[in-house]
Curated annotation (Swiss-Prot):
CDD domains: AlaRS_core (cd00673). Belongs to the class-II aminoacyl-tRNA synthetase family. This is Alanine--tRNA ligase. It holds the Pfam family tRNA-synt_2c. Its EC number is 6.1.1.7. The keyword Ribosomal protein does not apply. It is found in: Cytoplasm. The keyword Glycoprotein does not apply. NCBIfam families: alaS. HAMAP family: Ala_tRNA_synth_B. Zn(2+) binds at H562, H566, C663, H667. Catalyzes the attachment of alanine to tRNA(Ala) in a two-step reaction: alanine is first activated by ATP to form Ala-AMP and then transferred to the acceptor end of tRNA(Ala). Also edits incorrectly charged Ser-tRNA(Ala) and Gly-tRNA(Ala) via its editing domain.
Amino acid sequence: MPSISVADIRKSFLDFFVAKGHTIVASSPLVPGNDPTLMFTNSGMVQFKDVFLGTDKRPYSRAVSVQACLRAGGKHNDLENVGYTARHHTFFEMLGNWSFGDYFKRESLQWAWELLTEVYRLPAERLLATVYQDDDEAYDIWTREIGLPPERVIRIGDNKGGRYKSDNFWMMADTGPCGPCSEIFYDHGPGIPGGPPGSPDEDGDRFIEIWNNVFMQFNMAADGSVTPLPAPCVDTGMGLERLAAVLQQVHSNYEIDLFEQLIAAASRETGEKDLGHKSLRVIADHIRASAFLVSDGVLPGSEGRGYVQRRIMRRAIRHGYQLGQRAPFLHRLVADLVRLMGAAYPSLRAQQQRIADILKAEEERFFETLAHGMEILDAALDGGAKLLPGDVAFKLHDTYGFPLDLSADMCRERGVAVDEAGFHLAMERQKTQARAAGKFKMERALEYTGGASRFTGYEDLAGTAKITAIYAAGTSVAALKTGQHGVLVLDRTPFYAESGGQVGDQGLISSGSARFAVDDTLKIKADVHGHHGRLEDGTLNVGDTVQARVNTALRAATMRNHSATHLMHQALRAVLGSHVQQKGSLVNAERTRFDFAHNAAVSSAELREIERRVNEEILANQPTQARVMDIEAARSSGAMMLFDEKYGAAVRVLDIGSSRELCAGTHVQRTGDIGLFKVVAEGGVAAGVRRIEAVTGSHALAWLQQLEDTVNQAADTLRAPVAELNGRISQALDNARALEKEVAALKSRLAASQGQELLARAVQIKGLAVLAATLPGADAKTLRATMDQLKDQLKTAAIVLAAVDGDKVQLAAGVTADSVGRIQAGDLVNFVARQVGGKGGGKPDMAMAGGTDAAGLPAALASVAGWVSGRL
């Protein structure tokens, strides 16, 4: 079997299916555009999900793709295993071909066989397949048409605890498109431990799955029943790295040509000569994930996808540190990655320099604290400690930038566990303290003695200014260098500093080649603005003349929301009453959040009227006016003021529509600039305080479009026009309630019939009828009802009834009134419950219990008679 490069495997796969009439579809971004439930694209079918659901149409019915995938966040998280196993990766590539109502099982399996044996030239005798137990069609195609010996086609049943719960039955969700699948395995030979799929030793490395063919031919209903789809589809997936390992006759994905070259590059940059070192494998894997994430717009950050990116990068940096690196190195591997993968992914090549710059900046940030953090960790583990305290893990996270899984990774190498519960407790404690201290603690601590900042942001969003002070790590400094975080104070600024509920501006402060990215603007003093951010390039000194430029898009969106808040406040008072007073607000570019005094939930009708009033003022497109006047004149003008707010002698009064309030924030020129206003949430936050959240402009349009999509999807699901949706839902609920009643009646009848059958199984022990039995399909109510019937008919008895649901066990024990002096139901049920991993309790004549070990139930029930006999 000749060797073939990863690049050639990719090309051969695409060429093969193009010749079969398929359209090449480019890899979609790692950030899914059509599935908010996914953090990252983790399979080839993600970009086709809407096609399978029938909500998207494509101009082709056959597709082929090589999809970039990531599994390092959410439930699909392989991060901790990367570097320690032969086949785990964060980033990987998935080869796939799809049929949307075109070809089906025959073509899919025959082409898979043709590609593997004739193009890739895998030995036919090394291949075997699995099919779902009921999929005779796929079984016959393998054995009768392709000619695979029957002993190498394995039927896999429902091995996951329920009907259609199988390794060989694929479901998109609990309901919807589903179907059997057929997996193709490669046999590495008897020299490798492991058994075939379906055997007790299937997790060994001898038989490796290389290709899965999913046949979506059914629609699954909520009750678990399936009906045929009108247009069956095919969805296949084959991991490129795993296939390459087979074709290149190696047993680890890290030995394939692509990884060999990345590992060699990592060795070059770190100086580590042992090419089998796990740290080199980690770095080689993580450079792919990090670079592709940046290419798709995910930058290192402190939350969400950005934090996953940071965790991946810092794990790679730490492994480089372990190999002796004390300065940025990871970014230098970007060129090697582009050389190897740039042809297949043009966006990677186009963004090569940007990717390298972003990776380098994150490296510089982490290397500033990494060495000290490692010293903290080493000190905590000196003396043979077996547990890293939670507060130490949190200090590493909070002060030195060590993600929890990074600390856990290092501890695992030393055989040490991490007190994760203590870590989360420390994190929650800090959040509580931060909420209590308020956001401005750091700013108040800055010692500034210079002049005021003249705010020019009402008129201008850019301008020239002079740096009057620089702070780094809370201390006044003369200069700021590339990569440093800090706070700049300017003599004049267009940047609005957070106050009055409006967030601070973001933007850029520059001078020549120096570029300071402003993340937030906060007040150091009442008239001094602190510009918080990071110096991306160059050097800035106190006294430098700079250009200050606000992010205009964010400012405009924030102004829309702030102006809408004033209109909403006025509408709330008009609709709910003059008692409505502002209790708090948060206005940013995405939405406005407004807390107000009101002692009842705002009804749907009231919310509609509030929306109507605000949008009516928007449509009027009236100009806004801001005036500075003395406080008494403002009060006389009828301007709304907050009772708990302290005002100076001169105040700024804003007129917008029918609203007149004191406000120092930034606002639109005309009400029409707001565009559209929509309330998206209403609820209580404290006694007598309600909260409304609303969106405006493009955010309001996006919210309405998403709502429309949801309604349309619901209508499609119920096969009803949108206008008839309410009636159809009511009908479905009525049907469900009727079915619930039928089920309850059937359970009652079943209990009665089962009770009669069980009477004959009771045994007499010293004048007491003893019965222990299982009631299939029973719930707690049925167990109790059956128990009452049996006690009535057996007269003098001790009874245990059980029901099983998966691994869980429900138990009921009953003792007739004339026997509770000899046997207690609570003692009896606990005797049985202990044997199935549970406990329970109740009255002397009736007790209930639960357990988690269904496998122990038969023996537990069999022991009841002996236990009762020993008590009599």
